[in-house]
């Protein structure tokens, strides 16, 4: 397969991205998934060149150069970003990343990452962050994943994000940390999160339960 990446050039492109997000996140073609941050972001769309240029992936990036911009980030709605406010370098928030469930080609994420890398280099970005979603709100379903993350990938204290959302599950509540199935944990990790971890990323010490998106 071959993919073509496009940066949204107008409101129609952004609307197309929002409708795709709605289909993936909300399982609806009638609701437009949008928020106030959309107008501040750069939007990317990826198309399948050999399938009539079908839209298969969208995501958005938000460039952050000061504390006020950080406070306007999507992550700030759900996490206390006190530690990130101490970072003086330019940052980038990656968000609303979604892929057509019928496409499991790793080339899609690689295509996206190529664009992100160029943006990072151009803007001298030193820190990337964003939310990655587990499908559904069942904690039990992902206990192996959470134990795996707790044992290997919790962010250093200087980057830790504090609880802000009303409904969360804290990894400190996990018991028998060494009793989990590694194969199952890796299988159930969101592909995008796995990609971040392979690049050296970390996770917070809790997950947010979002009943709006059912994640």
Which residues are covered by each model-predicted region?
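Active-site ExK catalytic segment of metal-dependent nucleases
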Residues: 58-64
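Short amphipathic alpha-helix that is part of the acyltransferase structural core
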Residues: 1-56
């Amino acid at each position: 397969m071959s993919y073509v990446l496009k940066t949204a050039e107008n409101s129609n492109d952004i609307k197309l991205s929002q409708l795709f997000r709605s289909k993936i996140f909300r399982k609806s073609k009638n609701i437009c998934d949008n928020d106030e941050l959309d107008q501040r972001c750069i939007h990317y769309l990826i198309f399948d060149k050999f399938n009539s240029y079908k839209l298969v992936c969208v995501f958005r990036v938000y460039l952050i150069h000061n504390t006020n911009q950080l406070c306007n980030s999507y992550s700030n709605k759900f996490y206390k970003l006190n530690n990130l406010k101490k970072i003086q370098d330019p940052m980038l928030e990656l968000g609303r990343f979604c892929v057509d469930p019928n496409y499991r080609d790793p080339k899609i994420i690689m295509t996206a990452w190529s664009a992100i890398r160029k943006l990072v280099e151009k803007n001298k970005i030193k820190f990337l962050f964003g939310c990655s979603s587990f499908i559904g709100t069942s904690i039990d379903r992902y206990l192996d994943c959470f134990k795996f993350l707790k044992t290997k990938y919790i962010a250093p204290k200087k980057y830790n994000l504090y609880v802000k959302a009303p409904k969360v599950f804290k990894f400190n509540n996990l018991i028998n940390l060494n009793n989990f199935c590694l194969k199952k944990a890796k299988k159930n990790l969101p592909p995008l999160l796995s990609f971040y971890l392979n690049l050296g990323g970390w996770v917070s010490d809790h997950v947010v339960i979002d009943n709006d998106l059912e994640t």
